[in-house]
From Swiss-Prot:
Any Gene Ontology biological process: UDP-N-acetylgalactosamine biosynthetic process
Active site per database record: 116 (proton donor)
EC number per UniProt: 2.5.1.7
GO cellular component: cytoplasm
Subcellular location: Cytoplasm
TM annotation in the entry: none
Protein name: UDP-N-acetylglucosamine 1-carboxyvinyltransferase 2
Gene3D superfamilies the record matches: Enolpyruvate transferase domain
Binding site for phosphoenolpyruvate: 22-23
Length: 428
C-alpha cells in the first residue's frame, strides 16, 4: 500500500491536459457488450475502474486489447455469464452490466455493486425501468437476477432524475421491440456520450440531452470507433486547485460548456477565468470572496465537485454554505479537513465553511474518490506536509494525478507504507 505526501505552499503554474471522462468510460465499456463486432473506444483514462471493467468483460467471454488510452472489445464470444461476486462488487458502475446484458441476452445476474459509499444510492429506478421493458427482477443472496422472454418498448417515467438509471434503461432498450420513452431523463454530457456510441453502433435514439429520450429498438448493433469526451469532473478539480493555489494555469482538453456552473461560482469568488474552445485559463490575483453552492442535477453544480470546493472555501473571506441535494451523506471529508485546521460546521443538511484559515499539514484518510480530491487540494494549501492514505479511492478516478500536479509545480510524491502504518490506517 502507498500513501501520498504533499508539501504545501507551492504555487501551481503551467498547463495540464484532462483525461477521458471516468463517468463515461464506466458506461461505454459495458455498452460494447451490445455490439456484434469489435468496438474501439479511444481516449479512455488509465484508471483502476477502467481496468476492473475490462477484466469483467473478459470474465463473460469478451476479448479486450489495450493500446495506450484506446481499448478494443471483441464481444462476439460473450455469454450471459453470472457475475454474482468478485470484481463486480468493486465499483458501483458495474450495474451497467445489468442493462447491457439484459439488452443482449435477455438475462443477467449481477452482484450488488460497490464503489464509494455515499449514503443511500438505491437502484430502484433502474429496476423499475427493466420491469417496464418486460424483465422479471429478483434479489437473491446479494445479487440481482434479471430474466425476460423478450423486451418490449415502454413509457418509463423516472421518479428522480438519475444518470445511472437513464443510461441503464437506454442500454436495455436499444434492441427491445418498439419504442421506449424515458421521461424525466437526466441530461448529463456522459449520457450524450453513451448515446453517441450507441448511435454509431446503429441504435435509433432521439432527445438525448433533454428530459425526454425516445429509443426505437433495432434487431442488431454493429461495432464502431468512438472517442470519449473529456472528464469535466477532473477538469473541475484542477480548476478548483488552480483557484486555490494557482498563479496561472491552463487546463487543456476541456469542454467549457460542461463546467458553466463551476466557472460561474469561481468568477463570483473573484477568480480570473478565460475560456476558449478546448481550454480554460485560470489565474488568482485577488483575495477570494466566499459563495454558497447547492448541488443539483446537470446543468447545476455537480455533486462530484462539492468536496473539492469545500477545501477552496477555507481560503475565502467570511462563511460559505454548501448544500448537497444529490448525496446528502457526502460529508466524510469534513472531519479530515478539521484535522488540518479547517473551520467547518454541519447544520442540518448544510456545511458551513468559515475562512480564510491557514491549513496545517496532517495525516488524513480519503474515504471516497472526491474526498481524496478535497484532501489533495487542502494539502496544496497547507503549511507543512500532508500524508493522505486511501489512495485506492483516488486511483479509481484520477489518471496520473501525482505526475500532473508535479508538472504544475506541486511538491507531491508517493511512498510505500510500513506494516505499522498500514495497521494504524486500518484503525483510522
Amino acid at each position: 500500500m502507498q500513501k501520498l505526501l504533499i508539501e504545501g505552499g507551492h504555487d501551481l503554474t503551467g498547463q495540464v491536459r484532462i483525461s477521458g471522462a471516468k463517468n463515461s468510460a464506466v458506461a461505454l465499456l459495458p455498452a460494447a457488450i451490445l455490439a456484434d463486432s469489435a468496438v474501439t473506444i479511444e481516449g479512455l483514462p488509465e484508471i483502476s475502474d477502467v481496468d476492473t471493467l475490462g477484466d469483467l468483460l473478459e470474465e463473460i467471454g469478451g476479448s479486450v486489447s489495450r493500446d495506450g488510452q484506446d481499448i478494443t472489445i471483441h464481444p462476439e464470444k460473450m455469454m450471459a455469464m453470472p457475475l454474482p461476486n468478485g470484481k463486480v462488487k468493486k465499483l458501483r458502475a458495474s450495474y451497467y452490466f445489468m442493462g447491457a446484458m439484459l439488452g443482449k441476452f435477455n438475462k443477467a445476474v449481477i452482484g450488488l455493486p460497490g464503489g464509494c459509499f455515499l449514503g443511500p444510492r438505491p437502484i430502484d429506478q433502474h429496476i423499475k425501468g427493466f420491469e417496464a421493458l418486460g424483465a422479471e427482477v429478483t434479489n437473491e443472496q446479494g445479487a440481482i437476477y434479471l430474466r425476460a422472454n423478450e423486451l418490449r418498448g415502454a413509457r418509463i417515467y423516472l421518479d428522480v432524475v438519475s444518470v445511472g438509471a437513464t443510461i441503464n434503461i437506454m442500454l436495455a432498450a436499444v434492441k427491445a421491440k418498439g419504442r421506449t420513452t424515458i421521461e424525466n431523463a437526466a441530461k448529463e454530457p456522459e449520457i450524450i456520450d453513451v448515446a453517441t456510441l450507441l448511435t454509431n453502433m446503429g441504435a435509433k435514439i432521439k432527445g438525448v440531452g433533454t428530459d425526454v429520450i425516445r429509443i426505437d429498438g433495432v434487431p442488431s448493433l454493429h461495432g464502431c470507433r468512438h472517442t470519449i469526451i473529456p472528464d469535466r469532473i477532473e477538469a473541475g478539480t484542477y480548476a478548483i486547485a488552480a483557484a486555490a493555489k494557482g498563479k496561472e494555469v491552463i487546463i487543456d482538453n476541456v469542454i467549457p460548456q460542461h463546467l458553466e456552473s463551476l466557472i460561474a461560482k469561481l468568477r463570483e469568488m473573484d477568480v480570473t477565468i478565460e475560456e476558449s474552445d478546448e481550454q480554460l485559463y485560470i489565474a488568482r490575483n485577488r483575495p477570494l470572496k466566499s459563495v454558497d453552492i447547492k448541488t443539483l442535477v446537470y446543468p447545476g453544480f455537480p455533486t462530484d465537485l462539492q468536496q473539492p470546493f469545500t477545501s477552496l472555501l477555507t481560503q475565502a473571506t467570511h462563511s460559505g454554505v454548501i448544500t448537497d441535494t444529490i448525496y446528502s451523506a457526502r460529508l466524510k471529508h469534513i472531519d479530515e479537513l478539521r484535522r488540518m485546521n479547517a473551520v467547518i460546521k454541519v447544520e442540518g443538511g448544510s456545511v458551513i465553511v468559515s475562512g480564510p484559515v491557514q491549513l496545517e499539514g496532517a495525516r488524513v484518510k480519503a474515504s471516497d474518490l472526491r474526498a481524496g480530491a478535497s484532501l489533495i487540494i487542502a494539502g496544496l494549501l497547507a503549511d507543512g506536509i500532508t500524508e493522505i492514505t486511501g489512495l485506492d479511492h483516488i486511483d479509481r478516478g484520477y489518471e496520473r494525478l501525482t505526475e500532473k500536479l508535479s508538472s504544475l509545480g506541486a511538491n507531491i510524491w508517493r511512498e510505500e507504507m510500513t506494516d505499522i502504518e498500514i495497521m494504524q490506517d486500518q484503525n483510522m
